[in-house]
Design a protein with these regions (language model features):
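Hydrophobic, regular-secondary-structure patches
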Residues: 2-84, 236-242
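Acidic/polar short surface loop at catalytic or gating sites that assists cofactor/ion binding
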Residues: 37-45, 98-103, 213-224
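Soluble non-cytosolic domains of exported or imported proteins
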Residues: 45-46, 129, 228-229
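Hydrophobic secondary-structure segments that place a key small or acidic residue at a functional site
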Residues: 69-73, 79-91, 99-180, 187-190, ...
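Mobile, glycine-rich extracellular loop/lid and propeptide segments
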Residues: 94
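Mechanotransmission and gating elements of multispan inner-membrane complexes involved in transport
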Residues: 151-155, 163-243
Length: 243
């Protein structure tokens, strides 16, 4: 029930690249990529936060370096501006089904992010990073409070822990703890996508065939592919545990 955006990236540069697997709702991805239908046109589908720990139970668990969940929405500030909101993990400890503790989040995934201020802590609520482009546009500074209305039209606020320079789309967002965003948006336990950083073997013809249709492989080919750390086989195994 999920779909993947996978890339064959050089493993020693994983920290520079960040994620090389992105897990999204299959139907949402197909509608957007094939038919050009936006989220506003169709009922939105979500993944379940409760499935995140299962990713570290696949055959290639030791190759999963880090992962981050993401939930996106919008909030309207008290000055009338509508701005993008994203919830994620920053430095989060997750207890795996095995009983082990796995530390992960954006501090592990986005080593190139520059923060003027401090990273929000996952065990605190209502702290946020504000992207530098958005901060410049709205004259937001670290230490400020952003006041807005939530889904129930109740006034809430986010404390600006730092200003983020990412060099990407995050420079135009407010990014807060996943649990905070879920509460604001009324989407407890839900996420839009998962980004995964995995150590992989370069793709070859077998891996490319398998990524299109694993059922096209012979039994021997399937075993070789499944038991090799191709990005496509790791993604396939994630698909087996994430619904």
């Amino acid at each position: 029930n999920v779909m993947f955006d996978v890339g064959d990236k050089v493993n020693k540069e994983l920290k520079a690249f960040g994620a090389n697997i992105t897990v999204t709702s299959k139907n949402a991805s197909i509608l957007k990529d094939i038919y050009g239908v936006s989220d506003a046109d169709t009922p939105k589908e979500y993944l379940n936060e409760s499935d995140l720990g299962k990713i570290k139970t696949i055959f290639w668990t030791n190759n999963i370096v880090a992962l981050s969940p993401h939930l996106e929405g919008k909030i309207t500030l008290d000055n009338g501006y509508v701005i993008p909101l994203e919830g994620t993990w920053f430095d989060h400890e997750i207890e795996l089904p095995t009983g082990d503790i796995f530390s992960t989040g954006e501090t592990y995934m986005k080593s190139w992010w520059q923060i003027d201020g401090a990273w929000p802590k996952d065990n605190e609520q209502s702290y946020a990073l504000v992207g530098t482009a958005l901060a410049n546009k709205l004259q937001i500074h670290k230490g400020d409070s952003l006041t807005f209305k939530d889904k129930d039209n109740q006034e809430q606020s986010l404390y600006v822990a730092g200003i983020l320079s990412s060099g990407g789309e995050e420079d135009n967002k407010v990014i807060t703890q996943l649990s905070t965003a879920q509460d604001i948006l009324g989407l407890q336990g839900k996420i839009d996508n998962i980004t995964v950083s995995a150590i992989t073997t370069p793709e070859n013809e077998l891996a490319r065939r398998a990524s299109k249709n694993p059922k096209s492989l012979s039994m021997k080919e399937y075993e070789v592919w499944y038991c090799t750390a191709y990005v496509s086989s790791i993604a396939y195994q994630i698909e087996e545990v994430v619904q």
